[in-house]
Amino acid sequence: MNDPLAYLGEQLEAWKRAGTYQRLRVLESESAAEARFDGKDVINLASNNYLGLTTHPRLREAALEATRRYGVGSGAVRTISGTMSLHIALEERIARFKNVEACVVFQSGFAANAGTVAAVLTPEDHIVSDELNHASIIDGCRLSRAKIHVFPHKDTASAERKLAELDGQPGRKLLITDGVFSMDGDIGPLPGLVQAAEKHGAIMMVDDAHSSGVLGRNGRGTVDHFGLHGRVHIQVGTLSKAIGVLGGYVCGSRALIEFLYHRARPFLFSTSHPPAVAASCMAAFDVLEQEPERIQKLWDNTRYFKQGLRAAGFNTGVSETPITPVIVGEARTAHALSAALFEEGVLATGIGFPTVPEGKARVRTIVTATHTLEELDRALEVFARVGKRLGILVCRPD
């Protein structure tokens, strides 16, 4: 009998032949600067745990206390009986932190982006979107069935031209960008985009997943970083990266949040966060405000490691943040570099097409606030040794 799914196995074999097949690495310890993967202790440069909060004592204690008091789950979606006092307290905490009227928490950052874009727009509306926006934004745009207009990466003039072309046409306009782009580590041109949105009456939305806890005062994100409070209508963030736990959120006006309560499908049809998650997220925002030295250490480590990679002869692209790619070109080369690094005690993930464009494959590195200079020096030594052996060292780009 023919297997109707046989083509899946054929595709997997093709990826293996091309050297782009990826096996899941298994974490066998805490997610820390040095961690154990697949039975091997390595320097971890593949985690989004920017500030080391996954193991912070205050978050651990908050999770344990919430579990003791409320149990391990809510038992329902938010709109039936799954809204706990902890969920409301977390949303109010985030809203104060972000200086907005209200906030709603989603089960993931992906759900927050996709669910929000799909909820607030209709097929009669228009979306103007950066070509390198996150997959969750792209999927949300598709789900909305709105008309999608893509502009070249960070080209504010092109974005404004596209908005101008839509002036007078039926439907609403949404202008959307990442705050920090997850593959290249560059910062979105939010001031110019905000001006364009205001000029043409568009909704302005930013995905701050990789800038929450990284940019702005105490990690408030790109809106704070650029001083644009009150001028960005929809702010999306994550609780899974610098916050160190799980989930995503949307911030904005009270009307926006109440609308999402009624129309955002991931919110409507997913069980709410466990009490431990909500409580530990609240503790994380306290840490952001009370331990700003963590963010300073993150940036000190970022500058040190980025400078070391460039000095060794690696192409780190246009990175401006802790996300630092080592661009090598072909996907096979990126995966070979990642595998060789792991064998020598460094975990950094190889990334190729379709996550990044053809010919722009890279090994993505992220340093954290908890890496020591000794660990970073060891990682740089391994990168230089492996890069030389594989013949991928290049001159610094102009």
Q: What are the language-model segments listed below?
A:
Residues 296-305, 310-345, 355, 359-360, ...:
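Conserved PLP-binding catalytic core of the aspartate aminotransferase-like
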Residues 116-135:
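Conserved PLP-anchoring active-site segment centered on the Schiff-base-forming lysine
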Residues 2, 57, 61-65, 69, ...:
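PLP-dependent enzyme catalytic core of the Aspartate aminotransferase-like
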Residues 61-109:
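Conserved N-terminal alpha-helix of the aminotransferase class I/II PLP-enzyme fold
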Residues 149-206:
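Active-site phosphate-binding strand-loop segment of PLP-dependent enzymes
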